[in-house]
């Protein structure tokens, strides 16, 4: 009987000592700085190539592989949240505002920058799906990295950004794991930095105001609706910095909301039933009118040159067009403005 109790006691002790419990402890810092102190970054881009993302050649960020110590089957993922205002988007990713001129793209995630999640909006989102540690001790880390973005059209300038709170990452236990009273959230601030921003553009060589004398014609030269006759021609010439692609938009000065391809005649015109169309070079399709804006992707914006041309030019042809309302002879006047976008 005595030996039986000794055997049972030995087995009980063996089973007891193999039992392990999921555990977590915080070994990081609750406040963390992103990027080097007083960083300085320089880049050159076309004036209207906006938003322009600075590619510094290295990550402006913070990473730490040892923020939480975990063991015994503990399961952990990560959520992230950005507190800065959303001022735009790029390829589905939010651009967050720092100043009127400078914004940020932000990634959050596990320790490796390459696995970071592109952040959008201001809600908590899953930035690392997670894993479960085995019956051993390991750590869970995190990372944050950013890229500065130029937001507005401007001349070459230097922009200084002060230290700014970005947002937070929190540890997310799952699969029955619990953090208890352990610190789960860490915060991030972007260190102050300077952007040395150099922009490239073009200079207009032709006068900024161009008067095109329209030829006199007879109504018989435009017998049917849609018929056209060349009325006049002119050219625009520019001198550009290397690498600049020029785009242009025509705007109807009399009716700025006009998005058609027929220019509205001014109130000084006395002819009716006739309009004006503008063609470039040898194109067979007339140009349409758009908003007076240099923004990339502006409605009815068209490409004037490629980035390899430093002295681009365009030949413009103005044509009378029968609008189908019955032509009454008289004077014809129209005003169109040109807005160049340097991309």
From Swiss-Prot:
A carbohydrate binds at residues 65-66, 110-111, 138-141. GO terms for molecular function: carbohydrate binding. The keyword Disulfide bond applies. It holds the Pfam family Fimbrial. It is found in: Fimbrium. Keywords: Disulfide bond, Fimbrium, Lectin, Signal, Virulence. One of its GO terms (cellular component) is pilus. Residues 23-199 are annotated as: Receptor-binding lectin domain. Changing residue 110 to L: 80% reduction in binding to N-acetyl-D-glucosamine. Residues 287-307 are annotated as: Disordered. Disulfide bonds join 75-132. Residues 200-343 are annotated as: Fimbrillin-binding domain. InterPro entries: Adhesion_dom_fimbrial, Adhesion_dom_fimbrial_sf, Adhesion_dom_sf, Bact_Fimbrial_Adh_Pro, Fimbrial_adhesin_lectin_dom. Residues 1-22 form the signal peptide. Gene3D superfamilies: Bacterial adhesins - F17c-type, Fimbrial-type adhesion domain. Residues 298-307 have a biased composition (Polar residues). It comes from the Bacteria. GO terms for biological process: adhesion of symbiont to host; cell adhesion involved in single-species biofilm formation. Essential fimbrial adhesion factor that mediates binding to N-acetylglucosamine-containing receptors in the host intestinal microvilli, leading to colonization of the intestinal tissue, and diarrhea or septicemia. Also confers adhesiveness to laminin and basement membranes. May be involved in the initiation of polymerization of fimbrillin monomers during fimbrial filament biogenesis. Belongs to the fimbrial protein family. This is F17g-G fimbrial adhesin. It comes from Escherichia coli. The gene is f17gG.
């Amino acid at each position: 009987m005595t030996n039986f109790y000794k055997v049972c006691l030995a087995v009980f002790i063996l089973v007891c000592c193999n039992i392990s419990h999921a555990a977590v402890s915080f070994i990081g810092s609750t406040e963390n700085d992103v990027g080097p102190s007083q960083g300085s970054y320089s880049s050159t881009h076309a004036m209207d190539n906006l938003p322009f993302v600075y590619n510094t050649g290295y990550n402006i960020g913070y990473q730490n592989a040892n923020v939480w110590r975990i063991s015994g089957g503990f399961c952990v993922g990560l959520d992230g949240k950005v507190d800065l205002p959303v001022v735009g988007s790029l390829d589905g990713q939010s651009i967050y505002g720092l100043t009127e001129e400078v914004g940020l793209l932000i990634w959050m995630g596990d320790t490796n920058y390459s696995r970071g999640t592109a952040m959008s909006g201001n809600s908590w989102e899953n930035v690392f799906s997670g894993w479960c540690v085995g019956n051993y001790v390991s750590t869970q880390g995190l990372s944050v990295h950013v890229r500065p973005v130029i937001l507005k059209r401007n001349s070459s300038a230097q922009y200084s950004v002060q230290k700014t709170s970005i947002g937070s990452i929190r540890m997310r236990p799952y699969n029955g794991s619990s953090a208890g009273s352990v610190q789960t959230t860490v915060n991030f601030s972007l260190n102050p930095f300077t952007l040395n921003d150099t922009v490239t553009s073009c200079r207009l060589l032709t006068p900024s105001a161009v008067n095109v004398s329209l030829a006199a014609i007879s109504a018989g030269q435009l017998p049917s609706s849609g018929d056209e006759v060349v009325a006049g021609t002119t050219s625009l010439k520019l001198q550009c910095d290397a690498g600049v692609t020029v785009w242009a938009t025509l705007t109807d000065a009399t009716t700025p909301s006009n998005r058609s391809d027929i220019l509205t005649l001014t109130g000084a015109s006395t002819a009716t039933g006739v309009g004006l169309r503008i063609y470039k070079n040898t194109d067979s399709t007339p140009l349409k009118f758009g908003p007076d804006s240099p923004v990339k992707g502006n409605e009815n914006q068209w490409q004037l040159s490629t980035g390899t041309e430093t002295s681009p030019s365009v030949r413009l042809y103005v044509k009378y067009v029968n609008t189908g309302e019955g032509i009454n002879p008289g004077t014809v006047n129209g005003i169109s403005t040109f807005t160049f976008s340097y991309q």
